[in-house]
Regions:
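Structural motif
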Residues: 34-42, 90-94, 183-190
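A positional/architectural concept
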Residues: 10, 17-71
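C-terminal accessory module of base-excision DNA glycosylases/AP lyases that mediates lesion recognition
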Residues: 1-32, 122-123, 136-145, 149-208
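Alpha-helical ds-nucleic-acid-binding substructure associated with the helix-hairpin-helix region
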Residues: 21, 25, 54, 58-130, ...
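A general alpha-helix detector
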Residues: 43-48, 64, 81-85, 123-127, ...
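Short alpha-helical scaffolding segments that buttress acidic/His motifs in well-ordered protein cores
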Residues: 44-49, 99, 103, 142-143, ...
Length: 208
């Protein structure tokens, strides 16, 4: 895991000036910050595994997946593992297909994560979404956690919406216009605001 992004401290100062709730959260959660794993393949696998299941279930499946890979989660290793072995890890047929196709695209050089460095956020989301089992939410998680993009606001994320409801005393789901208002307010540091909102509802900081 790497250090926090270069923009982190500037973002905290900016958000504290912009919003009272954000100031309260930033002052409360001083023990940690966004940690980055500079391994796109690893993070994509983790994102696919974590789709539509609880955090605890995702962690359990990922642990078994890591053991199946003998602690070497890379395209060549994953490409060589039989689907039957991945099924025993607790992966659904769709997720196995997504992970296997991802590994194959890496091995055959049909997917190049370095291209994302030259793309804006929307271009990168489109490029990542071309991968099987990777939709907008998964692409946003990759941009936030792996590429450290500063202005990701994942409005499809249940945790973010719940945190907005809790902290701003709104119904669940919070009104779309209010979520959009916060987006504009926190820009260009929505990723940092998202991280602190997540932190307010989860004892352990989220990592990918």
């Amino acid at each position: 895991m790497s250090k926090s992004p270069k923009y982190w401290n500037s973002a905290k100062l900016y958000l504290k000036k912009k919003d009272k709730i954000m100031k309260k959260l930033i002052n409360k959660y001083t023990d940690n910050n966004l940690k980055t794993r500079k391994d796109v393949f690893y993070s994509l696998c983790k994102s696919i595994i974590g789709q539509q299941i609880s955090v605890a279930a995702a962690n359990s499946v990922f642990l078994k997946f890591n053991l199946a890979c003998k602690n070497k989660i890379n395209p060549k290793v994953v490409n060589s593992i039989p689907s039957s072995k991945l099924k025993k890890c607790g992966l659904s047929r769709q997720k196995i297909r997504g992970i296997k196709e991802l590994a194959k695209k890496y091995v055959n050089k049909k997917f190049n994560p370095k291209l994302i460095d030259k793309m804006n956020d929307e271009e990168a989301i489109q490029y990542l979404s071309e991968l099987r089992q990777i939709g907008r939410w998964s692409a946003e998680m990759i941009l936030l956690f792996t590429y450290n993009r500063p202005n990701i606001w994942p409005v499809q994320d249940i945790g973010l919406l719940r945190a907005i409801s809790n902290n701003y005393k709104k119904e669940y789901f919070p009104p779309k216009n209010f979520v959009n208002k916060l987006n504009k307010k926190f820009s260009p540091y929505c990723s940092v605001a998202t991280w602190y909102l997540w932190r307010s509802i989860d004892n352990e900081p989220i990592q990918y």
